[in-house]
Regions:
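Phosphate-rich cofactor/ligand-interacting catalytic cores and adjacent structured alpha/beta frameworks
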Residues: 2-89, 93, 131-210
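Long, hydrophobic/aromatic-enriched structural stretches that serve as scaffold segments
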Residues: 78-133
Length: 210
């Protein structure tokens, strides 16, 4: 069975692409998975990063190092391809959430129970799913289209999720300090990424700094 069709057929709650479509689109899905894994490697390589793990040191952590992160990245690469396929099929958010929970299990198995990439499973996974929507529609993967696909396809579900009482440390800290949580960022279409970080990166590139 074709690779992309096999992956999508193994996941519930959505219609798999046809075999012909899956055969055409599989290289694009794999390219998204490679880009996601490369982004995680680049983040790990970035130094200095006060408090955070890099190849230079472990920051403020005594339970993880760069090797822990690399094991996690290798374990998560298939997840980013799987969630891209879910995006191609415009799967409901519940299917994305199930896929992310399974990815978290793989991460914890690879790291011995250490949370290295829970945030990246959520945020980067959503971006891959949005990329899948655009791939399925034959659209280019530019930033504005990526953000719009995320909001159009899963914005309502993300808003509902963001309204839940937080149970994870990051969400509870955000609520206590009056900050915008990761879930709320996602529900708003990742404004910090698209309105602040990306323009800063593009300006740095134009200035020859990146």
């Amino acid at each position: 069975m074709n690779w992309a069709l096999h992956v999508s057929a193994s996941l519930p709650f959505f219609t798999a692409p046809s075999q012909a479509d899956a055969g055409i689109l599989a290289p694009q899905v794999q390219a998204v998975g490679r880009a996601a894994a490369r982004a995680l490697c680049d983040e790990l390589a970035l130094a200095p990063k006060p408090g955070l793990v890099s190849f230079a040191d472990t920051g403020s952590h005594d339970d993880m190092d760069a090797h822990t992160f690399m094991r996690s990245i290798f374990a998560l690469r298939p997840y980013y391809e799987r969630i891209t396929v879910l995006g191609m099929a415009r799967a409901p958010f519940a299917a994305l959430e199930r896929c992310g929970i399974e990815a978290e299990r793989h991460m914890l198995a690879a790291t011995g129970g250490i949370n290295t990439h829970r945030g990246a499973i959520f945020m980067l996974g959503l971006l891959c799913a949005a990329a899948g929507v655009l791939i399925g529609q034959g659209q280019p993967l530019d930033a504005s289209a990526l953000r719009q696909a995320l909001l159009t396809q899963w914005g309502d579900a993300l808003s509902t999720r963001a309204d839940r009482t937080p149970t994870l440390p990051g969400g509870m800290a955000s609520a206590r300090l009056g900050l915008r949580s990761a879930g709320r960022e996602a529900a708003l279409g990742l404004p910090t990424l698209f309105e602040t970080a990306l323009p800063a990166w593009q300006q740095a590139e134009r200035s020859g700094l990146a």
